[in-house]
Amino acid sequence: YYMYRARWNEHQHTTHLLPHWNWKGREGQVTPVYCYTDGVEGELFVNGKSQGRVRKDKSSRLDRYRLRWNNVKYEPGEIRVVTYNQYGEKVGEDVKRTAGEPAQMKFSVETPDHEPIACMVEGCTDEHNVLLNADGNDLAFITVSLLDKDGNECPLADDELTFEVKGAGTF
C-alpha cells in the first residue's frame, strides 16, 4: 500500500518505516529496515545514532521505490527515519518504538472516502462530528490497535477482543 501511496498521493507526503521494532531475542542480529516514501533520500537513526543516508536508485529494481538499510543491528528502543526531497528539504518522518505490554486500545474510524467520522465507540476520544445513518447505505471502517502504557503500538499482541453493536447498525 505505502509503495503505491508514495506514487499516487499528490496531496500528502508519504514516509512509512518498516518493520515494527519488537524483536525480543534478536538483539545484535542484522534486521533490515525499509522506508516507502515519495522523498528521494532518507536518513535512519537507531536510538538516536545515524545509520547513514541512502537515496533511491531508479536503475535498481529493488531501490527505485524504497529506501533500504540492510545492515541494521536490532536493539530495543526506537528507529526513526527522516526523508528529503530532491532539494534536500525534509518531507517526512516516521518512528517505530519497541512496545511494552498492551495496556489500552486505540480506535480509528473512517469512511470509504477516507473521511474521518465521529467515533461512537465507548472510550473513543475522536473529535470529528460526521455521523452515519443506519439506512443500509453508510459504511465505516473501524481499526482497533492495542497500545502499551506509553501509547506505542503493540504489533505482536494477539489478545482476543469482543465487540458488540448497539442500535440499528450491524457488524
Question: What is the meaning of each model-derived region?
Answer:
Residues C124-D126:
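Surface-exposed intrinsically disordered loops and tails
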Residues T37, L146, V165-G167:
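Flexible glycine-/small-residue-rich
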Residues G39-V40, F141-T143:
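Short loop/turn microsegments at loop-to-beta-strand junctions
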Residues Y1-C119, H128-L131, K149-E153:
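Substrate-binding clefts and catalytic carboxylate motifs of secreted carbohydrate-active enzymes
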Residues Y74-E78, N137-L139, D158:
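Extracellular Ig-like/FN3 beta-sandwich strand-entry sites
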Residues K49-Q51, D158-T170:
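Short, well-ordered beta-strand segments
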